[in-house]
């Protein structure tokens, strides 16, 4: 029986293990964490977004510069296949109003339990064997006289040990949420073998705004004023729109919501544009987008309401009465505008429809939902095997791709794990012949 060493017990690794075990391969899964699927469970805390229901032709566009490579992976395991697979685990799914697909109970734990039950007690093929608290050291072990194939060296609770298999599949994740296992430590290990790796960068991340206190006490290089940060951090901007054009001409415009943080912004609308913001900051030093606080109203209508006589009412009361702007939406206007500007009806109306916010930096990668960069597809053959390390395959977020939230991340991880496992099977069949 052929044996495969699989490093990484996240979604990509578990899917690869399922495919290999069902094909009759002895699979040993190694992971540095005490239990399986740590990041997967965290992703399901607010509702496990399995995939998206949109048509495949639109679905693949979410992968940006790598959509051609990801499209090849999704051909056999796209959104529809993910739902069908979940069904085989006894997990029914539904499509939310946004087109996102969730389990009926919204939870990740029941799906993971059913999945592990299948892997540990399969109806066909050998049981997958799990070795937790085993951290790959980045070193390859030398086989002894009675061993063949590829060896890896692990740090384990019992000390350093070597394991050998006929092939290796790496599903080590990116570099976000290091405490859950994805720490990016593997990057220099593969680089020393000549593997081309794009730098790991934060994706689906928050950003620090450029300083809004320009001079005087409290002035900082970046971040909100002390008052705004203390009063409004954690509050959402609801029913707004943002628009952004990069210096190279790429455009983004979308309605939705996001959240103010102590130093900037985060949330679904920001995440959707995060790759553009990040790359603009890296090339230009900053990124300025425009916030529309009332996307369903025209500038002319807003201006008319701002100019409407307000009598003895305060400006805040006037805006709340005429335009239903209050709370954080009023606060951001005061944060970004001078007293003279905010008392000028035309400047105020223009700011309500297009308030410029400048982002100074992406938040650290360890805070990001996911990461961009990784093993470049040019370093892999069509079966996801490293050309510089024959018999070693890669899958999941450690590959050089990124996608927004919405089910695209998990779908591509599952699809790449499945594809890499099929590549392993092809490799093993060739080695037999």
Task: Please name every model-derived segment.
Residues 2-29, 420, 424-425:
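N-terminal Rossmann-like FAD-binding beta1-loop-alpha1 element of flavoenzymes
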Residues 6, 10-11, 174-176, 399:
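Residue-level detector of alpha-helix initiation sites
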Residues 21-45:
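Glycine-rich FAD pyrophosphate-binding loop
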Residues 22-23, 35, 56-58, 75, ...:
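Residue-level recognition of phosphate/Mg2+-coordinating polar/acidic sites
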Residues 41-110, 243:
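A conserved beta-strand/loop capping segment in the N-terminal third of enzymes
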Residues 70-78, 97-117, 177-182, 208-212, ...:
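Short beta-strand to alpha-helix junction loop
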Residues 110, 118-320:
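Predominantly flavin-linked oxidoreductase catalytic cores and closely associated redox partners
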Residues 176-189, 193, 400-432:
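A conserved FAD-binding loop/helix module that cradles the flavin
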């Amino acid at each position: 029986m052929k044996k495969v060493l699989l490093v990484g017990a996240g979604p990509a690794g578990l899917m690869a293990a399922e495919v290999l075990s069902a094909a009759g391969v002895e699979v040993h899964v190694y992971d540095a964490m005490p239990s399986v699927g740590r990041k997967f469970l965290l992703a399901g805390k607010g509702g496990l977004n399995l995939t998206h229901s949109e048509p495949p032709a639109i679905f693949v566009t979410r992968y940006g510069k790598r959509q051609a490579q990801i499209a090849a992976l999704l051909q056999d395991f796209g959104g529809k296949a993910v739902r069908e697979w979940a069904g085989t685990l006894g997990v029914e799914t539904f499509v939310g109003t946004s087109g996102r697909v969730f389990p009926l109970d919204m939870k990740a734990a029941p799906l993971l339990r059913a999945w592990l039950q299948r892997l540990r007690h399969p109806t066909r093929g050998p049981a997958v064997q799990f070795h937790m608290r085993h951290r790959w050291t980045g070193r390859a072990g030398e086989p002894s006289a009675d061993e063949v194939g590829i060896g890896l060296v692990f740090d384990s609770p019992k000390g350093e040990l070597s394991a050998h298999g006929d092939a290796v599949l790496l599903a080590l994740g990116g570099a976000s949420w290091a405490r859950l296992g994805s720490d990016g430590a593997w990057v220099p290990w593969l680089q020393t073998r000549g593997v081309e790796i794009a730098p790991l960068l934060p994706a689906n991340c928050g950003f620090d705004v450029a300083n809004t206190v320009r001079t005087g006490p409290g002035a900082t290089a970046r971040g909100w004023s002390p008052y705004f940060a203390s009063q409004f951090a954690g509050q959402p901007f609801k029913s707004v729109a943002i628009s952004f054009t990069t210096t190279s001409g790429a455009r983004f415009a979308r309605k939705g919501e996001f959240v103010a943080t102590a130093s900037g912004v985060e949330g679904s609308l920001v995440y959707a544009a995060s790759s553009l913001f990040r790359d603009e900051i890296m090339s230009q030093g900053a990124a300025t987008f425009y916030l529309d606080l009332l996307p369903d109203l025209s500038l002319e209508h807003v201006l008319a309401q701002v100019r409407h006589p307000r009598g003895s009412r305060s400006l805040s009361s006037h805006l709340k009465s005429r335009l239903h702007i209050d709370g954080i939406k009023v606060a951001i206007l005061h944060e970004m505008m001078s007293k003279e500007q905010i008392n000028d009806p035309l400047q105020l109306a223009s700011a309500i429809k297009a308030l410029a916010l400048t982002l100074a930096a992406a938040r650290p990668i360890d805070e990001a939902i996911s990461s961009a960069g990784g093993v470049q597809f040019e370093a892999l053959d069509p079966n996801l095997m490293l050309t510089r390390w024959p018999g070693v395959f890669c899958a999941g977020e450690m590959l050089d791709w990124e996608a927004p939230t919405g089910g695209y991340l998990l779908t591509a991880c599952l699809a790449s794990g499945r594809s890499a496992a099929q590549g392993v099977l092809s490799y093993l069949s060739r080695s037999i012949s």
